[in-house]
Amino acid sequence: DVCSSDLDWDYDAPESAGAPTPRDASAGAMMASALLELSGLVAEPAATKYRNFALDVLRSLASPAYAAKAGANSHFLLMHSTGHLPADTEIDAAINYADYYYLEALLRCRALAELPASQ
């Protein structure tokens, strides 16, 4: 249930000696929020493309692969963020700004759903 971009910490990072690239829910949450904002500022068909991709990412973040169960994960909403891979710190961690941008993106989704159909 993970989208095609699969939320890598860096989309251009080379694979390291057989080790998988760490996932980064925070990057996905930030991207989804930004794309939802951008979808309201550009013309069609780009608006729909950005909105649909953001919604795919949010569905992925809401899946059991990234969403923590209530009370788990030190009470953070999202699991599997990467803070600073080059320094080998905050790998597969819960990061507060991941939750912030996730909630921001969800609020933007709600605002889009509340728009009149003509917009």
Locations of regions flagged by a protein language model:
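Short, small-residue-biased leader/transition segments that mark boundaries at the very start
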Residues: V2-S4
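CBM-like carbohydrate-recognition segments
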Residues: A19-S33, L38-Q119
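Short linear capping/connector segments at secondary-structure termini
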Residues: D6-A17, S81-G83
